[in-house]
């Protein structure tokens, strides 16, 4: 299936629903296999707060309403205002390892950067960011992977823990709003009534946490691997930092952090002549579209000077295009700017690194990236 077919699929939300459950209840994070959920896992999930399909797992018009409510906080103008804060976080992270001869790029920089930023945007304690990371990793896996029984238990515990963390904070923001996205969502109104119920807020918070860290972490990691393997491009970006945004866009096309998502066929149909039964799971492969030679000439070549033409699908396509795309772009740009500004003599420690891809069907990143460097003087 090529670029054009995936465009048609992504735009046709009536035929291909983003809700992988047929009822109104929200995602259970139990993986994408059809195996029944075991009783002990169901018992754990029984302690979670009820949720409904929201934002990413909702279809228009519900999706449209939810997206409108968060779009102001994630608009290009609002995101640009975060630049000093993001730059400060980047410099603080570099300060923590700059005296060493090497760095674990993911654990010491690419993971804490977006998790810290998301914590600040939501208005929750930075000290809890590694807990968010733990919950997020499990719940992302529950959204996009096939899970073992034990992994389902772990994911179920994460769902319950996340709900237990945020439900009292939602109630607190209803009484005492503060200047953050959580308060903005909790207290949003339509015709004088609360715009979002707790059942809607919880999955939206889930998605902001999940998408807000995983995509950016892998975008930074995947991009740095490109530079470590291409010293000429690394040198060019040091000399011409204005080219960094083009490099980020090409990483999103060439090695997209999210390779695909899922849709459920609501009726019988066909894609490129292949029959699709009602209820079937359909996978829009964004990575396949990004490497379609009819859309991108010589797609296997990493080229930041690629002529403008087709839009890459590194953030998806259509109504469910990633709401946090501008934030991820900004975080990645500032991350590369500060790394190249503060450090030099980069090299990859291949023996210490683990360049196997993370164990995920849909997410694309590296397991461990150990990078040698020198501090700029």
Model-identified regions with their sequence ranges:
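Cytochrome P450
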Residues: 1-377
